[in-house]
């Protein structure tokens, strides 16, 4: 249910953009995002920090987009958020020697430190790629092409990155079905 709720504002944004325009789509995105947070709080009693940050960014940049009737503000959001994710992952790994991916998934997975570092770095690179592709598309293609990319391209890229991560993680999983921590390679 939570994952489905994450896509509803994006789907509504896409449909509204195709039927109306950027201002209407931005307003629908902001309202749907606020409702999403309210529903999550009501149904689950809490909203994750990352979701609050993302919702705040959507509301801020969505309102700017609606007010000025200019999509570039939502385009900036994608660039800024992906850039921030990459920076946070890289600073945590190289400055603080703590791969954040391990903090997120470490309770579910037992991996060697090298694997956590590789995953963390890989996701940082992924966010940099998303940021750069977003910049390229927003500056060199039509507004409609950017909306299509935002609605489907980033999701496709995320699915591919997740599959690559899964394949990478698989090599470190225990082969006998046990949950031991001695799967070092």
UniProtKB/Swiss-Prot annotation:
Gene: yciB
Membership in a protein family: Belongs to the YciB family.
Protein's cellular compartments: Cell inner membrane
Transmembrane segments: 19-39, 53-73, 76-96, 118-138, 149-169
HAMAP family membership: YciB (MF_00189)
Topological type in the membrane: Multi-pass membrane protein
Main location: membrane
Annotated source species: Haemophilus influenzae (strain PittEE)
Key words, A-Z: Cell inner membrane, Cell membrane, Membrane, Transmembrane, Transmembrane helix
Name of the molecule in the record: Inner membrane-spanning protein YciB
Function: Plays a role in cell envelope biogenesis, maintenance of cell envelope integrity and membrane homeostasis.
Example of a GO cellular component annotation carried by this entry: plasma membrane
